[in-house]
């Protein structure tokens, strides 16, 4: 029967979840019934005393003060049923005394207004019901007035009462009450029943102790658990509730109290909807309803009763389950029973001693395994069917899309949408195929495991019997070995297919990677996953070869056993009794020839199996070598990556240091420029605020300051005199700017020049002249003071103090001429060889010497000696490189000699080479060109595209190609290099 037909037949059926109405633990519930005169209905309230007690206990642990206050309120003497203390204490949880609410009081859960007449539950204390306490018992039997109970869910009064009960709870022995007296209107005790939880007398202490246990963590953590429920019910509503409860349990049919007749039709308009009842009738009816609800709770359970009374909307998912899940559970139960049956039979082997019993047990095991295989097949066929349908649907839909795209005239948007849909269906088909393969692997795992358990049990039985006794079971053992190898082989081949699919998916993902920040890292991760899959594939293929070898070994053993039986077969010959018997000798010879031919066939088959087993062994060694090579290459790749990372880390550390120094220099230069700008702004502001004010020091103060400076730094001057002919000192006091101006005298005062212009002029002069350090330092004037900036960019004066010399100071030279432009680079054809370079070098040195002295003075103030030395070294290296390049070029020498006219070139006559005897003109490109064949011009765009498609242009593409190459090296090539093993014997 097909699945579609089964769904059609079972469409009108529903599946109810098993154990849907089971309760995890028993709780104590209290029903309170009262009459609402305004609505004319019964107000039914239910309290979960167990949950309230648990909640009050947790609150008691949180705050002991609230418990003490509630205990004080409970001891005020208001122990009546209407008080909160009496309602929350355990003693008040199961009473059944008739009481009535005194006056009108609104209740939010019952009605908008009115005076509810409530029946209170008072627990008869065992001490009160004892013979020595008749007065208290008679006081319980008399109706009393009490306050109404608010019908709110999880009311605060109940919580406070629960806390009071927890604080002032008596001993457990005194609180264990299991029965309640039912009191009639006249005050006589009619019977004793259990109202809250209808348990037996001997079960009451156990139920109470269970109820007083702390709640589980899940219940304490759920703050939304309801402890109270309330509702208004008319007579008709209560009859409908009774019918539903009777459909669950028919024992409740005679338990519903008799309600008065309700007027119907026009009588409801004239006389109202509710019948007229006295207070005594109302109290009696309320109490009977309370007893009925308690009995219904004990008969049907809280879950059904609460759903019937207080639940408005039911979720069908809570009760029903789908038919597919039900059918799957049925298949799983059948499979579980088959497994249990096989396990029972395997356990019987320990007590079996005779071979006859063991053979019977083997036959039963074969039947049990066949039933297990059948149940497993049914289950997995059912599980595979949706994926097969999805695969077929996807293939059909893709075929329709292909036909539509080929035959219909569609626009670009429609074609694009169809292509997206085709890709979606292809993905769904691929996922269905993967699910089918996974389920196939699970199926063969179950069957192979069962077969192996049976085979291992039989091998254990073989040790208990001798060779002669075991000969009867040898054939079954060979069949079992063959079946185990076959099932394991099929399971391993299914695993191999799954791994190949995953490998193919990884390879496609590698090839579809696009450029990005995470592309290289993703490629490395995919390659690592591919390596793990490849190792798993090696293991699976090794197991496949091992199973094939076991199959061949089982066939060889059976063939060898047949050959030995044929050879050991004894033939007895009798004497001839007649002439006809002698004539039958030819037939006997023919039968012997047939036996010999059959023996030869068996031997030939054994040799073939031996050859196949040898090839399997060779393939196993090949796979082992490939696995070792794969592991070695992977380890080498990991080591190389580690080495590259270490090198990169080392280089990166150096680079980080360089970048850090560079950042510090930039930050320092920015700070210097900022301070310089601030200083210039201050100077400009000062000049604008105080124009023409110049403060000059007297001669006496200047001489005293010079003597102090000379006495303070004699050691520093001696050190500088040893290394350089002059000392560059920067004075950081701003007062010496005026002093430097005085030293120059009035004859040397020039027009004021800004600091920026002075600095730019000195820079250009240094770049143009590039004087050597010796010329600069030796030819400086004796004393030159210029207003400059030190490292802190404060106004200061730079003073150059030369060594003590007997020569008098010379007057400053005139201003220098502008620096000459740099010479243009000489062309190669006009170069005159190394002689010209040697002539130019002294001329350049002479020019450098002829540069005026004062031209280098400002640059010497702006740059220190190390920068001048580095500039001079760069000039020397550039000149040496030019000389080396010019000398080392032989073509330059030839051109120079041609220019000088040393020798002349001779025109060479064109000579034709004789063609090769074996070469054709069609294969010679030069011959074709001479004949006038035109070559095809290559387009630049095509050439550019061909170069852009090279794999080495993009690092990601290059990495992908390298990963694919490594994957190809790691993957086994045994399927291409060696022929596949003919394994049709066990594949069929």
UniProtKB/Swiss-Prot annotation:
Residues 921-938 form the WH2 domain. Residues 160-175 have a biased composition (Low complexity). GO terms for cellular component: autophagosome membrane; cell leading edge; cytoplasm; cytoplasmic vesicle; cytoskeleton; endomembrane system; nucleoplasm; nucleus. The keyword Transmembrane helix does not apply. Keywords: Actin-binding, Coiled coil, Cytoplasm, Cytoplasmic vesicle, Cytoskeleton, DNA damage, DNA repair, Lipoprotein, Membrane, Nucleus, Phosphoprotein, Ubl conjugation. It is found in: Nucleus; Cytoplasmic vesicle; Cytoplasm, Cytoskeleton; Endomembrane system. The keyword Iron does not apply. It holds the Pfam family JMY. Belongs to the JMY family. This is Junction-mediating and -regulatory protein.
């Amino acid at each position: 029967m097909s699945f579609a037909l089964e769904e059609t037949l079972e469409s009108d059926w529903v599946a109810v979840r098993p154990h849907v109405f089971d309760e995890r633990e028993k709780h104590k519930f209290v029903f309170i019934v009262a009459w609402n005169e305004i609505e004319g209905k019964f107000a039914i309230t239910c309290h979960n005393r167990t949950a309230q007690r648990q909640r009050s206990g947790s609150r008691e642990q949180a705050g002991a003060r609230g418990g003490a206050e509630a205990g004080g309120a409970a001891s005020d003497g208001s122990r009546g049923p209407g008080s909160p203390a009496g309602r929350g204490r355990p003693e008040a949880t199961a009473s059944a005394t008739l009481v009535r609410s005194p006056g009108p009081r609104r209740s939010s859960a019952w009605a908008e207004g009115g005076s509810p007449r409530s029946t209170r539950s008072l627990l008869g204390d065992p001490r009160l019901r004892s013979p020595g306490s008749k007065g208290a018992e008679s006081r319980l039997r008399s109706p009393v007035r009490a306050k109404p109970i608010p019908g709110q869910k999880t009311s605060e009064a109940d919580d406070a009462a629960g806390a009071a009960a927890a604080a002032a709870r008596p001993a457990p022995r005194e609180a264990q009450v299991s029965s309640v007296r039912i009191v009639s209107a006249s005050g006589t005790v009619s019977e004793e029943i259990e109202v809250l939880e209808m348990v037996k007398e001997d079960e009451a202490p156990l139920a109470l102790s269970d109820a007083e246990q702390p709640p589980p963590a899940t219940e304490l953590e759920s703050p939304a658990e309801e402890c109270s429920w309330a509702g208004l019910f008319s007579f008709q509503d209560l009859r409908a509730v009774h019918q539903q409860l009777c459909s669950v349990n028919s024992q409740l049919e005679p338990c519903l109290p008799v309600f008065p007749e309700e007027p119907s039709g026009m009588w409801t308009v004239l006389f109202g909807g509710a019948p007229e009842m006295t207070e005594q009738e109302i109290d009696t009816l309320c109490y009977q309803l309370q007893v009925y609800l308690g009995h219904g709770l004990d008969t049907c359970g809280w879950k059904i009763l609460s759903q019937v009374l207080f639940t408005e909307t039911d979720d069908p998912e809570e009760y029903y389950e789908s038919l597919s899940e039900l059918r799957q559970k049925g298949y799983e139960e059948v499979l579980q029973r088959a497994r249990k049956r096989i396990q029972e039979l395997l356990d019987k082997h320990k007590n079996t001693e005779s071979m006859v019993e063991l053979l019977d047990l083997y036959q039963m095991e074969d039947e049990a395994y066949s039933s297990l295989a059948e149940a497993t097949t049914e289950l997995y066929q059912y599980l595979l069917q949706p994926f097969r349908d999805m695969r077929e649907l996807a293939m059909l839909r893709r075929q329709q899309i292909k036909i539509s795209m080929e035959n219909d005239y569609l626009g670009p948007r429609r074609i694009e949408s169809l292509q997206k849909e085709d890709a979606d269906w292809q993905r769904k088909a691929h996922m269905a195929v993967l699910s089918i393969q996974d389920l196939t692997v699970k199926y063969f795992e179950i069957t192979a495991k069962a077969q192996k358990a049976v085979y291992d049990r039989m091998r254990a039985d073989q040790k208990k019997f001798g060779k002669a006794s075991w000969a009867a079971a040898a054939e079954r053992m060979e069949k079992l070995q063959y079946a185990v190898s076959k099932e394991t082989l099929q399971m391993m081949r299914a695993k191999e297919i799954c791994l190949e699919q995953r490998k193919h998916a990884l390879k496609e993902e590698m090839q579809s990677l696009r450029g990005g920040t995470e592309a290289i890292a993703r490629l490395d991760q995919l390659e690592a996953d591919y390596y793990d899959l490849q190792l798993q594939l090696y293991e699976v293929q090794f197991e496949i070869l091992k199973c094939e070898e076991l199959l061949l070994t089982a066939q060889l053993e059976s063939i060898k056993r047949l050959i030995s039986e044929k050879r050991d077969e004894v033939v007895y010959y009798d004497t001839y009794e007649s002439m006809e018997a002698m004539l039958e000798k030819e037939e006997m010879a023919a039968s012997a020839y047939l036996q010999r031919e059959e023996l030869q066939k068996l031997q030939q088959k054994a040799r073939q199996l031996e050859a196949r087993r040898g090839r399997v062994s060779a393939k196993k060694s090949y796979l082992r070598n490939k696995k070792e090579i794969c592991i070695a290459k992977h380890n080498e790749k990991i080591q190389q990556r580690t080495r590259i990372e270490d090198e990169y880390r080392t280089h990166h550390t150096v680079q980080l240091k360089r970048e850090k120094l560079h950042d510090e220099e930039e930050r320092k230069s920015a700070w210097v420029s900022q301070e310089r700008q601030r200083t210039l702004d201050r100077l400009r502001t000062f000049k604008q605020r105080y124009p023409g004010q110049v403060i000059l020091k007297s001669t006496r103060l200047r001489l005293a300051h010079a003597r102090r400076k000379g006495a303070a730094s004699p050691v520093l001057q001696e050190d500088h005199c040893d290394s350089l002919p002059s000392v560059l000192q920067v004075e950081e006091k701003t007062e010496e700017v005026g002093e430097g101006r005085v030293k120059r005298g009035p004859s040397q005062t020039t027009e004021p020049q800004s600091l920026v212009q002075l600095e730019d002029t000195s820079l250009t002069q240094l770049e143009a002249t590039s004087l050597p350090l010796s010329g600069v330092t030796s030819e400086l004037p004796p004393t030159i003071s210029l207003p400059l900036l030190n490292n802190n960019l404060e106004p200061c004066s730079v003073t150059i103090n030369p060594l003590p010399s007997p020569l008098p100071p010379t007057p400053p030279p005139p201003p220098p001429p502008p620096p000459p432009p740099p010479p243009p680079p000489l062309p190669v054809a006009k170069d005159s060889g190394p002689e010209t370079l040697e002539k130019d070098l002294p001329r350049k040195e002479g020019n450098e010497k002829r540069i005026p002295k004062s031209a280098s003075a400002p640059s010497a103030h702006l740059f220190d000696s190390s920068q001048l030395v580095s500039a001079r070294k760069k000039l020397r290296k550039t000149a040496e490189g030019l000389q080396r390049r010019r000398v080392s070029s032989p073509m330059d020498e030839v051109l120079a000699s041609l220019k000088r006219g040393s020798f002349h070139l001779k025109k060479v006559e064109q000579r034709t080479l004789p063609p090769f005897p074996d070469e054709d003109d069609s294969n010679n490109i030069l011959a074709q060109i001479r004949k006038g064949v035109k070559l095809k011009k290559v387009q630049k765009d095509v050439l550019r595209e061909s170069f852009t498609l090279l794999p080495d242009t993009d690092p990601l593409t290059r990495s992908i190609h390298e990963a694919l190459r490594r994957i190809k090296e790691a993957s086994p090539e045994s399927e291409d290099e060696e022929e596949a093993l003919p394994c049709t014997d066990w594949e069929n």
